[in-house]
Amino acid sequence: MKSPNRLLIGGVLATGLTSIPLCGAAAGFEFTPIGSAFSDDGSGSIRLKMPATFGVALQCGISVQGQVDETGVAQVTRVTFSGSTPLCSLITARGLPWNLVAKSTATVYMEHVSFIYPSGPLCGGNTILSSWTPYTQRLLVFNQIVSTGCEVVSMDVKISMLSIKYR
């Protein structure tokens, strides 16, 4: 007679093995058009807190460029900061490419987000949550900690060349 544990494990394995063919490839969302280059419209804005600003939010412009890879991930390969204060132009993006991974038509994970200010430590390297507004094609971020003492308070970037679709 088989023990109850063996029967349970056997049943779980049999159920798992019979369901594998039914699952198929994982469905998901992707940025389109695949293989296309993209850039923002030049009106992007970002508010950052970092040790170099002593926790005060610094308002800057942000510009992004990149390409959608064959898997539907939008890879941001160039980020520039600008603004009316000279401090903004001293911020440098790190960890590029920043991967924009669509989780739904409205949710995007931004991977590898990091930046540095000359007199401060590296901020980031984390994945942060952002929103995508399909009708205005805007990437929005609110109150995302990228590392200790470093935060993206807000970001708004319009990338009219991109859209998200279910694959």
Regions found by a protein language model. Give the residues of each.
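Bacterial N-terminal signal peptides that target proteins for export
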Residues: 2-11
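Bacterial N-terminal signal peptides
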Residues: 10-20
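N-terminal segment immediately downstream of the Sec signal-peptide cleavage site
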Residues: 21-78, 151-167
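Short, hydrophobic/aromatic-rich segments at coil-to-beta transitions
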Residues: 39-45, 105-111, 137-139
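Short beta-strand segments that buttress and anchor functional surface loops
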Residues: 47-53, 112-115, 143-144
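Predominantly extracellular/secreted and cell-surface proteins with exposed
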Residues: 54-134
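A charged, solvent-exposed segment within the mature domains of Sec-exported extracytoplasmic proteins
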Residues: 117-167
